């Protein structure tokens, strides 16, 4: 049986950074606001925003909830967050 491919979004890094900047938060502050401060480092946020690392689905969902946007707007490259 084949595995379902992971979610990939070329625009996810820019959308995550846009959310953080729209909320006027530093990378350390957003880490605490999304509730993963004890599990991740500021460098993880930097890697997500640069597209070096893909965040776990729970992190993507936390960003969506914080920004009050549908999670589909984060993972679908055809949709904008604003």
Question: Model-flagged regions — what are they?
Answer:
Residues 24-47:
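Short alpha-helical DNA-recognition segment
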